[in-house]
């Protein structure tokens, strides 16, 4: 019987000591701690503790690992305001004719009609015009000069002068973030945040996984503005979520079909891979089909998965859509108990934090693909 609390946002809250928010990644990547969720039939919720390197022992020959190959844009530009103060623009998406939707900081001091200059170009500053506010996002529409009408020109500008946009809860920055806040297989620029479960996969671990006969394939989901937005709808039966651009290729669909035929399991690396796979299946009427376009799928308790059997994931923020997604796999109360266990055992949370492994045997019976 469904628990009515599963549809209340307040039921997905938990308290996290500030010291448990990871400020820097561990080295090597695969040295992060790993909490392995016990199977449904287990007599306790204690779980097993290891490292992400140990995760290879949980995988089987014939399994299919699906990763998200998006690459984080160096989308944060430092600007100087007309009064001399500094600000930031997080460049998000094109709005045509050299106009781009940006998140602005400080928002109250970057208003429509203001002009700012790219801070990195001290000798020949590049003027940018704040045209309008965007009520849907809380951002600003910013006009770039004519030389930057083309998206490729903007990408080149960001690559040269931009910075990786780390989440606001990471306050310790250094030059290594440019490499460390990307997965090793990131190849398709377009995200403003990393698919963080993939940050744990080192070259050595990927090689070891392939050596076990595990197949690998990729989807693309460009993590967008919504990743910075908290869920605000208390009644989750009325929840709608931001859309994110997804590409699921014919080759990926064929790889999933081949995995099923050989008796393998589809293992998603990260919630973004889950959303891409399940979104493509939903668009296909329940069957996984190639897809290129936006996905706004809501995954929360009561959802029956169509593609994904298991998940490697990080520990997520309270009341977030990602927490709802993981709860759909293993149950809300069970998830919160496991989070309490992780906190008690000094696991590190969020983007640069540790990981959780949800094996197919740990997934709720009603949620499993049929």
Curated annotation (Swiss-Prot):
Pathway: tRNA modification; tRNA-queuosine biosynthesis. It comes from the Bacteria. Its main location: cytoplasm. Transmembrane segments: none annotated. GO terms for molecular function: S-adenosylmethionine:tRNA ribosyltransferase-isomerase activity. It is found in: Cytoplasm. InterPro entries: QueA (IPR003699), QueA_dom1 (IPR042118), QueA_dom2 (IPR042119), QueA_sf (IPR036100). Pfam families: Queuosine_synth. The keyword Transcription does not apply. The keyword Cell division does not apply. Gene3D superfamilies: QueA-like (3.40.1780.10). Its EC number is 2.4.99.17. One of its GO terms (biological process) is tRNA wobble guanine modification. HAMAP family: QueA. This is S-adenosylmethionine:tRNA ribosyltransferase-isomerase. The lineage of its organism: Bacteria, Bacillati, Cyanobacteriota, Cyanophyceae, Synechococcales.
